[in-house]
Curated annotation (Swiss-Prot):
Pfam families: RRM_1. It comes from Arabidopsis thaliana (Mouse-ear cress). This is Serine/arginine-rich splicing factor SR30. GO terms for biological process: mRNA processing; RNA splicing. The modification Phosphoserine is found at residues 193, 210, 212, 214, 219, 221, 227, 236, 246, 256, 260.
Length: 268
């Protein structure tokens, strides 16, 4: 996971008419903000991703704003990749900690869940997936289509049963619902479908550093930074080739003159 997610928070249950400047007003006091990505779906609630410069500021924002009442809406604030940081206000969102801060168990019997609504938390996912068996770990994270998650089962049979029973089922929480897909997790699998994984990787490589959340980095395109270096190089090559051609012509002319027969002089 990119380090920017350590300093990016998810803000859920926002009013449907909220503006970006109002989101900034809610969080600016906790530290410098790099970017705010506000999403207003056709049906509320809205949500946003707020990136801070410092991960500690993100922690402070979670502690200060999770559960905050904004215009009659109780905000839900957690670290963007599933609530992996601990604070008293987000303990219920983080599967990595219990009440005593003991780390949760992991296993090799893992499934990938895609198509989750943006408001889904690890606890929502765990509640849904435990219908198929004993869940020992769950985590959610944002992707380009919304949210995805991973769920670890304590045994192989429960994992296989979850794929059969819960694939293409309706996931619900207090805020929204969506139909999800469940498949066995592979080490190379990510939060996108197998059909478009190759094209997405190739596109992301071509974009390079310009895919950052920062507005400054978005304004810099790798293609623009490379082209000024490539153009002088092509000119220098063409100049060199033209000079070499002219030199070869002059040498060939001088050879032809030196090798041409001298006409005899006829005296009268």
């Amino acid at each position: 996971m990119s380090s920017r997610w350590n300093r990016t928070i998810y803000v859920g249950n926002l009013p449907g008419d909220i503006r970006k400047c109002e989101v900034e007003d809610l969080f600016y006091k906790y530290g410098p903000i790099v970017d705010i990505d506000l999403k207003i779906p056709p049906r509320p609630p809205g949500y946003a991703f707020v990136e801070f410069e410092d991960p500690r500021d993100a922690d402070d924002a979670i502690y200060g704003r999770d559960g905050y009442d904004f215009d009659g809406c109780r905000l839900r604030v957690e670290i963007a990749h599933g609530g992996r940081r601990f604070s008293p206000s987000v303990d219920r969102y983080s599967s990595s900690y219990s009440a005593s801060r003991a780390p949760s168990r992991r296993s090799d019997y893992r499934v990938l869940v895609t198509g989750l609504p943006p408001s889904a938390s690890w606890q929502d996912l765990k509640d849904h997936m435990r219908k198929a068996g004993d869940v020992c770990f769950s985590e959610v994270f944002p992707d380009r289509k919304g949210m995805s998650g991973v769920v670890d089962y304590s045994n192989y049979d429960d994992m296989k049963y979850a794929i059969r029973k819960l694939d293409a089922t309706e996931f619900r929480n207090a805020f929204s619902s969506a139909y999800i897909r469940v498949r066995e997790y592979e080490s190379r699998s990510v939060s996108r479908s197998p059909d478009d994984s190759k094209s997405y990787r190739s596109r992301s490589r071509s974009r390079g550093p310009s895919c950052s959340y920062s507005s400054k980095s978005r304004s810099v395109s790798p293609a623009r930074s490379i082209s000024p270096r490539s153009r002088p190089l092509s000119r220098s090559r063409s100049l060199y080739s033209s000079v070499s051609r002219s030199q070869s012509r002059s040498k060939s002319r001088s050879r032809s003159r030196s090798n041409s027969p001298v006409s005899p002089v006829i005296s009268g």
